[in-house]
Amino acid sequence: MRICLIAEGSYPYVTGGVSNWIQTLVTGMPEHEFVLHTIGAHESQRGQFRYELPVNMVAVYETFLAPQSFSGKRWARGIRLTEREKAALAGLLGCGGARPEQAEERIAPPIDEVDWDALFGLFRSRRLRHPADLLAGRDFLDLLVVSGAERYGHIPLTELFWSVRSMLLPLIQTLRQHVPKADLYHAVTTGYAGVFGALASHLYGKPLVVTEHGIYSREREEEILKADWVREHLKELWIEHFYRLSACAYRYADRVLTLFDRNREIEIELGCPPEKTAIVPNGIEVEAYGNLPAAQPDGRFRIGAIVRVVPIKDIKTMILSFALIKRELPEAELYIMGPVDEGGEYEAECRRLVESLGLADVYFTGHVNVREWLGRMDLMLLTSVSEGQPLAVLEGMAAGLPWVVTDVGDCRGLVEGSGDGLGPAGIVVPVMHVERIAAAAVRLARDPRLRAEMGRNGRERVRRLYTRERFINEYRRLYDELGEAETWRASASN
């Protein structure tokens, strides 16, 4: 079977949990042939792969969201729109009719609000030589004037136009790309990747699987609410846009998978039909983390963090917490193990924070072989403000190490279990709560018996529930099931 994986903002440009998940999936199914359609942010990323591509990944197609230039007279031609296309665009802009009753409580448009079939046809039409042919057309501008008056009367028309332009350009560019032929499409998020998967399924009539590690629309909402690049009166417009992209993926998908119960509940709340949803947890090679090389006893207490140095991991809270830990445990050391080149100014700010606090024994190791370092650690720490089901936590648990984790994603489920009869594998603390994080770490540092017990609990939980074999077999079964259904449909139609 040929499977087209569709990634966004991850593999193969960025190391981390989602990218490692993709690498594990592909290498675990040598019987299948994979092609990759990957969506990056900027053209400068082209060819800058952080992973050695598996031998059964036979092709890579790269798309980038950074908008093309509008300069040049050849982009000045506008196009006329059919009534169906106008209605579809109005729906995409949230102006397609009466707003749902729940909209005041939850920004989540109904799943069938947008006529995506019409938009796919419009955005890929030969009439459209460039996105500007649409955005500069009289029909579109008239639609924007009318819609703006009805829904966005509080936004100046010029400002509304440039905001809508910024929203639509990446979407149109994504949907105008070559769509590789495959027997099955698998988007590893919703968003632009999910919409591209919906397009592929629509064009070729093939099954679509969507896997959400985190809930894409919720993550974009959190980013936009905090962002200073979006004016306050435009944030609702942007937030709803990303909810519509996710709704598109839910609508066209044959299966929508996620990693844990709460994510599935959120997907259903956002309009995904429950019968499409399922849970397949992450999985790792448990035995690879047994009997790791350990440091010789030297009186030091080593705290490890397997993490990229980026804002969503909240490294600053980790550093501030370590400053409190250091007051109680002068022998403590903090090892931040992960790429530092993605953080940009944030990474520099973290280093300056360490200096300003006068902290010794904070080490930014950069990218390392995690298995070579885990055995040296006494305790693991995660202070993220958003997560899915972190592979890093599973790796530490498999190594028999206790954790202090913030209460995000499925961290509580991993550490405390969900009725599996095992005890806790660490301590769960509130997000950004420096004092609680530090207190939990100090408590575990002073109780080696508790650390050992939690380490055993964690390793056994991973061995029972989060193995690579189980993860691969679940997806193999799903691929085979959808592939057989597609074969049956094809034979029945002949």
PLM segments and residue spans:
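A short, well-ordered alpha-helix in the C-terminal region of glycosyltransferases
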Residues: 201, 436, 443, 450-481
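Carbohydrate-associated surface elements
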Residues: 262, 283
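Conserved donor-binding/catalytic core segment of Leloir-type glycosyltransferases
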Residues: 293-324, 335
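Glycosyltransferase donor-sugar binding loop
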Residues: 333-348
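Aromatic "clamp/platform" in nucleotide-sugar-dependent glycosyltransferases that forms part
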Residues: 385
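Short hydrophobic beta-strand element within catalytic cores of glycosyltransferases
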Residues: 402-405, 409-415
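Conserved acidic donor-binding segment of nucleotide-sugar-dependent glycosyltransferases
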Residues: 416-418, 422-434, 443-448
